[in-house]
């Protein structure tokens, strides 16, 4: 019925917001902002109605969660970097019906997921920064998915991504884009050295790993990448333990995915972290290579409906 039209992996560095403001950082992230705007325009051209963002700044300790409130509006200051993002206004319509559908299909496929359509919870800046540049006119509806998963299996995140695609393609009357909002390596500069590393990667080792991953992506080496993802997420300091990336690749077919990534904003350093904007073309997949769920099959597992 519905269509998953686009699947980007995007940066959300808070220095993008600083780049708008008068001061020494003004204009310094224009390439990343332009990349967001280009991806947003592609979504418009493709008829996308809803952006689903896998947000590595939404930390959760149990289950997966979907923020699908009917409307988001407020003023945001980052608790992590309040000197970077302060008093940033935001507003976007939500899509409660799609959010509930996504959760239902994920649960049916063995990945415990809760939809929150009646909540005071606002999105985090992994969602809000991209929306600032892709959705300033509230053209798109927005859903945020928790992707800073503290006690979760990457295989379950991959399964979640595939389940969300099935929900869209099998049951939704509309067109959707999935976004993995997070960096590659995410080792922040040591306190006191942030200015020195404002435009650099923390270590040659991490930069080498990131660049090798990008080479694999551009050559569609998805089988080897999926195999190494858990170790890369750990040793490479992947943002959010790379759960956003696992979700995106799960939606794309996991190790069976067969298209090269397109770099929109080339790899760049930000406060020691490795960033980019890239688009992963959506190709036909049957999900045969997506890992089965793990948590819901564990001995002693009880569903959240019983625990609460």
Go through the PLM ranges and name each one.
Residues 49-55, 174-184, 248:
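Beta-strand elements within well-structured catalytic alpha/beta cores of enzymes
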Residues 184-190:
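Short, conserved secondary-structure transition motifs
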Residues 1-49, 61-159, 170, 191-308:
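Flexible, D/E/H-enriched segments
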Residues 162-176:
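Non-transmembrane, aqueous-exposed alpha-helical and coiled segments at domain scale
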């Amino acid at each position: 019925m519905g269509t998953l039209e686009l699947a980007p992996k995007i940066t959300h560095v808070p220095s993008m917001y600083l780049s708008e403001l008068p001061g020494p950082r003004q204009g310094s992230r224009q390439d990343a902002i332009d990349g967001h705007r280009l991806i947003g325009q592609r979504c418009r051209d493709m008829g996308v109605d809803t952006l689903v963002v896998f947000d590595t700044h939404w930390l959760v300790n149990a289950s997966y969660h979907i923020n699908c409130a009917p409307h988001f509006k407020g003023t945001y200051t980052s608790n992590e970097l309040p000197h970077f993002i302060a008093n940033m206004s935001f507003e976007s319509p939500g899509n409660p019906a799609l959010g509930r559908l996504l959760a239902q299909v994920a649960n049916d496929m063995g990945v415990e997921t809760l939809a929150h359509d009646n909540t005071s919870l606002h999105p985090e800046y992994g969602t809000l920064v991209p929306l600032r540049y892709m959705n300033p006119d509230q053209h798109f509806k927005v859903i945020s998915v928790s992707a800073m998963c503290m006690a979760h299996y990457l295989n379950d995140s991959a399964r979640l991504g595939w389940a969300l695609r099935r929900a869209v393609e099998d049951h939704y009357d509309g067109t959707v884009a999935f976004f993995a909002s997070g960096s590659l390596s995410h080792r922040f500069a040591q306190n006191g050295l942030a200015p020195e590393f404002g435009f650099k990667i923390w270590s040659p080792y991490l930069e080498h790993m990131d660049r090798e991953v990008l080479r694999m992506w551009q050559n569609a080496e998805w089988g080897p990448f999926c195999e190494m993802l858990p170790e890369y997420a750990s040793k490479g300091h992947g943002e959010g333990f790379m759960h956003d990336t696992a979700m995106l690749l799960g939606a794309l077919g996991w190790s069976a995915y067969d298209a090269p990534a397109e770099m929109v904003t080339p790899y760049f350093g930000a406060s020691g972290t490795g960033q980019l904007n890239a688009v992963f073309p959506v190709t036909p997949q049957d999900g045969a290579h997506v890992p089965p769920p793990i948590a819901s099959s564990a001995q002693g597992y009880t569903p959240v409906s019983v625990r609460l």
